[in-house]
Amino acid sequence: MRTAEIREKFLSFFEGKGHLRLPSFSLIPEDDPSLLFTSAGMAPLKPYFLGAKPIFGGREWRRVTTCQECLRVGDIENVGRTSRHNTYFEMLGNFSFGDYFKKEAILWAWEFLTEHLKLDPGRLWVTVFEDDDEAYEIWRDLVGVPEERIGRFGEDENYWPGGAITHGPNGPSGPCSEIFYDRGPAYGTPDETGPNTGSGDRFVEIWNLVFTQYDRQGPIPGPGILKPLPQKNIDTGMGLYRVAAILQDVEDFYRTDTFFPIIQEVARMSGRPYEGKTSVSHRVIADHVRAVVAALSDGATFSNTGRGYVIRRLLRRALRHGYLLGLSDPFLHRLAPLVAELLGDFYPEMRENLPAVEKQIRLEEERFLETLEGGLKRLDALLSGLKPGEVLPGKEAFRLYDTYGFPLDLTVEIAAERGYGVDTEGFQKAMEEQQSRSRAAMAFEREIFKKGAQVLEELYAERGATEFLGYNALEAEAEVLALLAGDQSLLEAGPGTEVQVVLDKTPFYAEGGGQIGDFGLLEWPGGRARVETTRKTERGIFLHKARVEEGVLRVGERVRAVVDPRRRDTERNHTATHLLHAALRAVLGPHVRQAGSLVAPDRLRFDFTHPEPLKPEELERVELLVNRWIMADFPVTWRYMPLEEARKEGAMALFGEKYGEVVRVVRVEGSPLEGLESKELCGGCHVRRTGEIGAFLIRSEEAVSAGVRRIEAVTGEEAIRFARGSLNRLKALAERLEVGEAALEERLEKLLAELKEKEREVESLKARLVQAALGGGGGASLEEKGGLRWTVAELPGLDAKALRQAADDLVARGADVALVLSGGQAVLKLSPKAQGMGLEAGALFRALAEKAGGRGGGKGALAQGGGLDPRKAREALPGLLP
């Protein structure tokens, strides 16, 4: 039976038992920051186990079934080496939130396994918690499992969470019952006589039934008290791939139909045949590529922290095993389409996101293989210096790992092939000495010898400001002068470390004049750091905020500084900002002055002084002037001059910017006929000619504050994308309304007029409905207490507005306290007389809700809410009146 068929049989079976089938939730938990990935079938349903109402599709469902994709990396070192561990798996589950309990869960599990999957009842074993007589008796008396195939175990094996009674945590917990399948003596060891015995694979756990019935309370650690929960829940999990291996009669899940095609493709790529349990690398690659594709398809990205590092680690581990098979070029991305083909029918996001996933994997592979190549060269040099039979020192093996990300197992493998050993104990000692923070990231802070501010002052005194090369180049060779972390100076920084890098010269533009700081890469032999942004001190020393991704960055290192090519888009937007400023002055008048700006690769934002919103024709005129300027392809030039001279020439200064004695003036020629010319003091980056901007489109115009307006615009390809998107939306709207685009506005006006007329009709009908309901009584007879007339009316089918109108009408008819109910909604209205006697609507409604259920509030004469029991409300209201 194919895996997809098993999955469908399970979900259909429990649908037949009154369960709602839900699609798999994302691997990326939406509202649970405690989880990196969804790691169990019940994880996305946690709120409903804790008491939240399980509302799906507008109704309450107490029974749910899912096939949930999960990702766990706690036992990653065992993946590929055993038949029980994998990272990405699918968990079949049926859940009850305060509905059925042990009897149904056990009977249905047995029914599904024996009648629908046709498993031999004689090969099924079960275990229960040692004190759970109820579950034991259900298995023995109702199901008919012989006592010799029912095992009783303690809290470590058959209680959830494991060991909770003695060790905690406090909270919902309960016994569990596990179902095992006996694969026969061929899969076991002599000491394996039943579930949880021996070390073989004979007895395979296929289903765990958790009976959440207690609230564990007490000291941690220490013996806890188990108090019965008011709501008893069922949480079950069946391992889809384990069941598939049994039904497909293969030795383990690696040979099932969703795994084995990947293993076969790895064997074909590498020329190394798969030989079962000994082919660890084939297994690791198949497992890890599935996990990486699934995580990326759900929105994860590679990074050095959190879930991004988990999938990076999985990819690199798979690449290392590929290297052991002789796969020295990127190959994992070529397996991604196969993963999507095998799983995409049930997880369509894998097919939908495949192009992006392939690209991400390819780029990540290329980066890591570059690192491996550098490590291989270093290892070759080290081994060449050893005598036959000697051992590579552990500190050298660790340096390979530290600097090049070169894995120890690969070092051992290559050294062994050439007749050398590796001091693995020395490797571990070196790692401990470096005080590795975790497997997720490592940071090195050697010889913290000076405060960062002191270092910057000394650098400026010795070398002056950073030399900026970015006006003419996006790449440059530079020397690392300092590394700063917080207020401390470092001599070196390893993978995962975030530092401020000071270079002797740089092509990176430092944030200023509205233009964002450049981002990109610093590269050196065996290493790379990603620059996230660039700023500079008042003395002109550039600080590159960077995170080391590969290798170790050291003071004195020669690096290649590479600005991200999107800087060209920033240049387009910066020059366009100057053109926009001049065009606004030409259209609106000389009162327009810059009041702020943002220049980024994907957009520009320009704040300017102007007292009122721009008229549509003014915006159109501004946009047209800028685009004519662009099409004319005028030159953009700049030169340095004394500040006073620049001001005399009419160069405009930027808002909030500080200038020195000598300034840079950027000039853009314009058409004398249009009265256009731009001349501004600016240290930013610009295009050489206006034609390079391509196009200019205004996206929005709005107020920032009194007398200050803001325009957001796009240029170049972003402008084309924006225009195309707008046209596509217009076309789609026209098609939806079944008119030509030219007639769209007329059609919309007609529809809006019709809508207003219908709304008037609806309001009229609601008013008549209220009057009819009140005229019919609606249970709204007036009663009196303490001089106040009160009434409770039930009027089905009204919305909140109509309810308020009904309450107003009742007060107008003489009621001092009117409570109107419709469905789950309620409105309470007081007359001036009732208020004069000290009643307040909000307080009265809350008091009523305490006695009749529900919730709500208000103030003065009006309160509203929902959930009141009509009978209880009618009985309770007079008792709350004075």
From Swiss-Prot:
The gene is alaS. Catalyzes the attachment of alanine to tRNA(Ala) in a two-step reaction: alanine is first activated by ATP to form Ala-AMP and then transferred to the acceptor end of tRNA(Ala). Also edits incorrectly charged Ser-tRNA(Ala) and Gly-tRNA(Ala) via its editing domain. This is Alanine--tRNA ligase. It comes from the Bacteria. The lineage of its organism: Bacteria, Thermotogati, Deinococcota, Deinococci, Thermales. Binds 1 zinc ion per subunit. It comes from Thermus thermophilus (strain ATCC 27634 / DSM 579 / HB8). The keyword Protein biosynthesis applies. Consists of three domains; the N-terminal catalytic domain, the editing domain and the C-terminal C-Ala domain. The editing domain removes incorrectly charged amino acids, while the C-Ala domain, along with tRNA(Ala), serves as a bridge to cooperatively bring together the editing and aminoacylation centers thus stimulating deacylation of misacylated tRNAs. Residues 853-882 are annotated as: Disordered.
